């Protein structure tokens, strides 16, 4: 079925007027991140608190029918929270907390589907149809792989409120490697907080003028960011007196090779806040001794051989036939990477399973 146009969805949406309030309820009532909470009072409550004791008649008339609502209130989920940009149909920021326990478990992304966030009014939501055939991938800000502990938490990362149009190679390559590094940090830090989001940065023309322009995709004009950012805050343990480790990174939304180091994309938190218009970790005492995460830790991403081997090992599970499985091994060797013992053990186990299945299917076919 063809996707409805934006105008028709705006007219037909029964949730158009109620959606603003629905989003506010989600932001106020959801359960989840407890260590660092980013709450904003609903606009109506904020306006009420801001009034002077003796409100003038002019002020009362001014807000008689309410102020415009932007839908930027915090929306909370099982293991992430976000602020949504209703005009661009992408998140402004997405906050998550990960630990060693959260990145292991039985949750499997093959059971998850990309879909609109039910808390976002349909008039302001992106659709899968906006992405399909656009030349851009659906890029997670809070990745599914950070939520192996909970099927619900993982499924919620597939809401389109957590997704931005992302370069395919960037999504599966460099950005993926940054996400893997964040998970690796949980081996050395008990708590890791991550804020990720899109940026649309200005570029300078030949005549010296600065402009901001960006592509939009689909009927809903989903904004394609020029860059992506990630802020990482790591704590050794709740009892530790060691300084917190912090790093802010901005990467272009394009393919990035293996030669580029993560530290090359590091920026100061202050500069990122100026770029984004956001204040990150506002409850963090910046007067304390906060260390550069690239000085405390390695900031080293997986190299070509390690990363290729990792991806090939994952493809073993997805193989549905002996022929497909054999192609995984052929592709790995063609890339110049030799399989390690772990890969070979997984490969042999999967090969036995597929051969047994194919023999069973052949017998059933003969009997029928």
Curated annotation (Swiss-Prot):
Binding site residues for a divalent metal cation: 171
InterPro entries documented for this protein: DNA/RNA_non-sp_Endonuclease_sf, Endo_G_ENPP1-like_dom, ENPP1-3/EXOG-like_nuc-like, Exog_C, His-Me_finger_sf, Non-specific_endonuclease
Cellular-component GO terms for this entry: mitochondrial inner membrane; mitochondrion; protein-containing complex
Active-site residues from the entry: 140 (proton acceptor)
Subcellular location: Mitochondrion inner membrane
Highest taxon above the source species: Eukaryota
Pfam family, one: Endonuclease_NS
Transit peptide: 1-41
Requisite cofactors: a divalent metal cation
Keyword Hydrolase found: yes
Keyword Metal-binding among record annotations: yes
EC number: 3.1.30.-
GO molecular function, one term: 5'-3' exonuclease activity
Keywords noted in UniProt: Endonuclease, Hydrolase, Membrane, Metal-binding, Mitochondrion, Mitochondrion inner membrane, Nuclease, Transit peptide
Gene3D superfamilies documented for this protein: 6.10.250.1250, Extracellular Endonuclease, subunit A (3.40.570.10)
Miscellaneous field: The active site contains 1 hydrated divalent metal cation that has only 1 direct interaction with the protein; all other interactions are via water molecules.
Family: Belongs to the DNA/RNA non-specific endonuclease family.
Subunit structure: Homodimer.
Name used for this protein in its record: Nuclease EXOG, mitochondrial
Gene that produces this protein: Exog
């Amino acid at each position: 079925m063809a996707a409805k146009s934006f105008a028709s969805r705006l007219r037909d949406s029964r949730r158009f007027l109620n959606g603003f309030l629905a989003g506010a309820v989600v932001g106020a009532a959801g359960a989840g991140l407890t260590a660092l909470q980013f709450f904003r009072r609903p606009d109506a409550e904020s306006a009420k608190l801001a009034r002077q004791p003796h409100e003038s008649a002019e002020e009362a008339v001014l807000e008689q029918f309410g102020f415009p609502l932007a839908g930027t209130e915090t929306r909370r989920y099982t293991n992430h929270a976000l602020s949504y940009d209703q005009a661009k149909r992408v998140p402004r920021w997405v906050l998550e907390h990960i630990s060693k326990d959260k990145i292991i478990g039985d949750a499997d992304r093959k059971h998850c589907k990309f879909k609109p966030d039910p808390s976002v009014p349909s008039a302001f939501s992106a659709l899968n149809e906006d992405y399909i055939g656009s030349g851009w991938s659906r890029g997670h800000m809070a990745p599914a792989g950070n939520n192996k502990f909970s099927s619900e938490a993982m499924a919620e990362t597939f809401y389109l409120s957590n997704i931005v149009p992302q370069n395919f190679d960037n999504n599966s390559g460099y950005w993926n490697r940054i996400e893997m590094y964040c998970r690796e940090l949980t081996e050395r830090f008990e708590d890791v907080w991550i804020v990720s989001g899109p940026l649309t940065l200005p570029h300078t023309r030949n005549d010296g003028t600065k402009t901001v322009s960006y592509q939009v995709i689909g009927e809903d004009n989903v904004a394609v960011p020029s860059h992506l950012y990630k802020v990482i805050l790591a704590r050794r343990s709740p009892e530790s007196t060691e300084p917190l480790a912090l790093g802010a990174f901005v990467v272009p939304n394009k393919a990035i090779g293996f030669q580029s180091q993560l530290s090359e994309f590091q920026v100061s938190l202050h500069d990122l806040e100026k770029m984004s218009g956001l204040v990150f970790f506002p409850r963090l005492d910046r007067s304390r001794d906060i260390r550069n995460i690239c000085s405390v830790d390695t900031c080293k991403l997986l190299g070509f051989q390690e990363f290729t081997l990792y991806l090939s090992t994952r493809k073993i599970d997805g193989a549905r036939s002996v022929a497909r499985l054999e192609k995984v091994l052929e592709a790995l060797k063609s890339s110049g990477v030799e399989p390690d013992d772990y890969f070979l053990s997984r490969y042999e186990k999967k090969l036995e399973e597929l051969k047994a299945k194919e023999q069973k299917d052949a017998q059933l076919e003969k009997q029928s």
